Amino acid sequence: MKIYRSTLLHTPASPFAVPDALQTFSDGALAVGDTGTIAHLGTFTEVLAEVRAACPDAEVHDLRGGVLLPGFIDTHVHYPQVRVLGGLGMALLEWLDRNTLPEEARLADAAYARTIAGEFLHGLASHGTTTALVFGSHFAGAMDEFFAEAAARGLRVVAGQVVSDRLLRPELHTTPERAYAEGKALIERWHGQGRSLYAVTPRFSLSASEGILDACAALLTEFPDVRFTSHINENNQEIEVVRGLFPGARDYLDTYERAGLVTPRSVFAHNVHPNERELGVLAAQRCSVAHCPCSNSALGSGLFPLRRHLAAGVHVALGTDVGGGTGFSLLKEGLQAYFMQQLLGEEGAALSPAHLLYLATLAGAQALGLDGQVGDFTPGKQFDAVWLRPRAGSTLATVLAHAESEERTLAALFALGTGDDVERVWVGGGVVFAREAEA
């Protein structure tokens, strides 16, 4: 048994539903068993007494001087795009054509894909992300490299081969038959192995014909516990193209709905420009939306209508959208989400630091159906955590030293925190990133 002593902050419930959902311990502790399961949570004095009564030799890890949060959960991030981060000055479709698709084509080479997988997974872990819903590669071999590397590093990943059959580069296209066959083989090799799960992943309706969408639906039917993810309503130009490709569809969501792809296992990225029917269906079907505020801002896609999603009952979590976004940091995404709602004025949703933490942690676990395992520090869940410790003399260290409350501490972490403040990261009780090991 190990005891971790630190300032502890987590949201075991949604602040959108429970106003006092933020739970804080200024001198708190977690006791973690040998299997990585949290056994006790409370003040350090309480936890030490409980654990030492049964386990006198339990070791104490003193993490004071920093803040311990649940591991971040990224619900939309692209594995092949780590090297195209920073492509500013373009809207979505031009950015895809000029920056992204040429790079994605390079992952046909397995050795190159292996290198990219390592860079990508290091980017996640080094920014405190312990679980991610990952848009994969168009190549099955590249997905084998990805899952193998994720297993070696110990991260939790939900990922799948991306499938398309039109309007991209020809080498990225597949057929419905091949999409089904390769997807099935990948599911049988990787789904449920260790910490890996599979997500059926058509790129978006713009590049996926009805045949591709039907093949995806066949996989969801055959494997009832795999997940589904795709893009929706990101950019007005994209929406118009999809409307022309599916003249019989009521709207963008209907292109997926008609194929049977709108279910509680579905996570749709962006949804910046939904209509009321789409919001109603997403809520009724208990789908989730991955809100990617940095990407939406960088690509000029629009301001996310969070208040409308919440009013309709649609579940929302955060995604970084590497490489359309601006990096792997969910602290940055939380801050940008806050800015975006501020800019919307009366049409925006009022967000507190507790909301930002929830969106970056438990909300993602709920979107992925993993909230029984991760997302907060409730005893019985896995110890997935990030220890943030600012450098001595930094502005963040100064602010934290004078913070009047734990909520003020949390606000400062989102406002000022960066990847450089991530000191150590655990998944299932094991260290997956340590800053000192990078020195």
Curated annotation (Swiss-Prot):
GO cellular component, one term: cytosol
EC number: 3.5.4.3
CC cofactor note: Binds 1 zinc ion per subunit.
Pathway(s) annotated for this protein in UniProt: Purine metabolism; guanine degradation; xanthine from guanine: step 1/1
Binding residue positions for Zn(2+): 76, 78, 231, 321
Keywords assigned by UniProt, alphabetized: Hydrolase, Metal-binding, Zinc
Record-listed substrate binding positions: 78-81, 203-204, 231-234, 321
Catalytic activity: guanine + H2O + H(+) = xanthine + NH4(+)
Protein name, per record: Probable guanine deaminase
Taxonomic source organism: Deinococcus radiodurans (strain ATCC 13939 / DSM 20539 / JCM 16871 / CCUG 27074 / LMG 4051 / NBRC 15346 / NCIMB 9279 / VKM B-1422 / R1)
Gene this protein is translated from: guaD
